[in-house]
């Protein structure tokens, strides 16, 4: 083992609004030594996801916040570099939750084996990981799409949205994506197979959406919030379903958005149109749905029915800048940090 220190990125202070590089700090500590029953893991890939922004706040949401000076949380794909646990062998690849650091100890609980030579190990953080599972559960169990439905997907080229749209097409939906910029919209249509994709930065976005969804919207997969939802709301059909996955446009907000209070309009639409709007946290669904997810998506990948794009950034030290860019929509595909080269 040539590396002698463990790099860690910790939460230096809590952001006020949008995160800045100064909210993070790179530290170096001794590489831990496994005790009996433990394994030493070395991360190779780190997943960066929007939910991490909420964990930087002081208040608890659905999970405890990251404490100041603690390692930032995150899913990882690691290799076992030393094992004192008979269930794991040196060199094995595992999915773990070791966060923004090079090395971590584990007693084996919660580790998911990928074998010795997985073809695409980083896929376990994306299309076959939490983002893919989020899309699968949110659309199929909450959105309940039917053939012929109009499905609108916010953040259509992101890790979750790109999967939602493609699964929707497999289920016979007419799929409309919403993304930022012409390049992403072109990718959604030409590569992912969306029927249409609209640029939410266009001045006439709301008018374009209304013209495109001339028969209304049956399922809206919400990843963004803000003005995109404002444009979607009046177009929702009677009995529409809205899986509420995320609100990335609001994660950095420090106050209520400007403008009139639209809560009564929202509640009125939900009442009159009998709209089903349901938030969900993916960790609640692993026991009942994960096996089917892996089986279905693995088959779709093998058959070429699902396309997947990674935005790979080299170097753990670049994680803060990449994460800040993620919240600004600068990534194109699933954002993954390659922290180290495989052993």
Residue ranges and their predicted role:
Residues 30-48, 56-100:
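Glycine-rich beta-strand-centered segment in the early N-terminal region that forms part
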Residues 93, 150, 174, 240-241, ...:
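Short glycine-centered segments of the SAM/dcSAM-binding site in methyltransferase folds
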Residues 101-102, 180-190, 262-267:
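Short, glycine/polar-rich helix-capping loops at beta-to-alpha or helix-loop-helix junctions
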Residues 227-306, 339-343:
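Glycine-rich phosphate-binding loop and adjacent beta-alpha segment
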Residues 204-214:
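Short amphipathic alpha-helix with an adjacent loop that forms part of the alpha/beta core around
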Residues 72-79, 86-155:
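NAD(P)H dinucleotide-binding glycine-rich loop of Rossmann-like/cofactor-binding domains
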Residues 125-203:
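Mid-domain Rossmann-like dinucleotide-binding core that forms the NAD(H)/NADP(H) cofactor-binding site
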Residues 3-6, 303-312, 320-343:
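C-terminal capping/lid region of NAD(P)-dependent oxidoreductase domains
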């Amino acid at each position: 083992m040539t590396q002698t220190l463990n790099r860690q990125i910790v939460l230096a202070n809590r952001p006020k609004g949008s995160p800045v590089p100064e909210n993070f700090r790179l530290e170096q500590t001794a590489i831990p030594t496994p005790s009996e029953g433990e394994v030493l893991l070395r991360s190779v890939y780190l997943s960066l996801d929007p939910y991490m922004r909420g964990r930087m706040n002081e208040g608890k949401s659905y999970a405890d916040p990251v404490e100041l000076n603690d390692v930032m949380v995150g899913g990882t794909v690691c290799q076992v570099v030393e094992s004192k646990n008979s269930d794991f062998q040196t060199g094995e690849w595992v999915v773990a939750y070791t966060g923004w650091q090079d090395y971590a100890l584990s007693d084996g609980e919660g580790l998911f084996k990928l074998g010795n030579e997985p073809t695409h190990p980083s896929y376990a953080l994306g299309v076959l990981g939490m983002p893919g599972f989020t899309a699968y559960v949110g659309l199929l169990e909450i959105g309940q799409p039917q053939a012929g439905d109009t499905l609108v997907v916010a953040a259509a080229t992101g890790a979750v949205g790109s999967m939602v749209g493609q699964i929707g097409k497999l289920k016979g939906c007419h799929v409309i994506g919403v993304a930022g910029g012409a390049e992403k919209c072109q990718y959604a249509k030409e590569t992912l197979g969306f029927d249409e994709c609209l640029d939410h930065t266009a001045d006439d976005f709301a008018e374009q959406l209304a013209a495109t969804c001339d028969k209304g919207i049956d399922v809206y997969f919400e990843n963004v919030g803000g003005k995109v939802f404002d444009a979607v709301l009046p177009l929702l059909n009677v009995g529409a379903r809205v899986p509420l996955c995320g609100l990335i446009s609001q994660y950095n907000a420090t106050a209520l958005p400007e403008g009139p209070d639209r809560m009564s309009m929202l509640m009125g639409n939900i009442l009159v149109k009998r709209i089903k709007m349901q938030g969900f946290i993916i960790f609640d669904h692993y026991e009942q749905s994960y096996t089917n997810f892996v089986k279905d998506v693995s088959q779709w990948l093998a058959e070429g029915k699902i396309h997947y794009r990674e935005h790979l950034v080299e170097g753990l030290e670049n994680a803060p800048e990449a994460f800040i860019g993620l919240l600004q929509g600068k990534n194109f595909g699933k954002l993954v940090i390659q922290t180290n080269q495989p052993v």
